[in-house]
Design a protein with these regions (language model features):
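Alpha-helical multi-pass transmembrane bundles of energy-transducing inner-membrane proteins
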Residues: 96-103, 107-152
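Transmembrane helix-loop-helix hairpins at membrane boundaries of multipass inner-membrane proteins
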Residues: 1-99
Length: 152
């Protein structure tokens, strides 16, 4: 149940930052995403059997990886906002970037918790698509070329 709430929250925040083009809303959504990720991390550390779903299971290694992902994710989001402030990027590109970043972290969390090889493969491919959106968020010719080079 907790994983379903996490997925709904992350995809809801990703849709929010994509459709709402406001600087303050992006900050609030990023803070909420960090809180959701920290809450999931806390639940996994406190109760290892929090996920009783068929396809997902937490073990010691997944706890370590999700903790590292949470720390990396929070620092990435902070660094992204510093980068956007220095660059004076528009809110459309920022929304695409943040939505892709939120979904990327959700997919990586799913990869670490996956107990089924098919789900693992689907989520690993979803991370590839999210990373390609992160590469192409500038929407210029160089970004397009880099995205195609990433795929092939």
């Amino acid at each position: 149940m907790e994983l379903i709430v996490y997925i709904i929250a992350v995809f809801g925040l990703a849709a929010f930052v994509y459709f709402v083009r406001n600087k303050k809303a992006h900050y609030i959504a990023a803070i909420l995403f960090c809180c959701v990720q920290l809450t999931l991390n806390y639940l996994i550390i406190v109760d290892r059997n929090v996920f009783l779903e068929y396809f997902f299971k937490s073990d010691a290694l997944s706890i370590i990886f999700i903790s590292i992902l949470t720390i990396t994710g929070i620092t990435t989001i902070i660094n992204s906002f510093v980068y956007f402030e220095n660059r004076k990027d528009n809110y459309f590109r920022r929304g695409i970037y943040l939505a892709s970043l939120f979904v990327l972290f959700a997919c990586m969390t799913g990869v670490f918790l996956s107990d089924n090889i098919n789900i693992l493969w689907i989520l690993a491919e979803a991370t590839t698509l999210c990373i390609s959106l992160l590469i192409y968020h500038d929407r210029n010719e160089e970004a397009l070329e880099a995205t195609w080079k990433y795929f092939f």
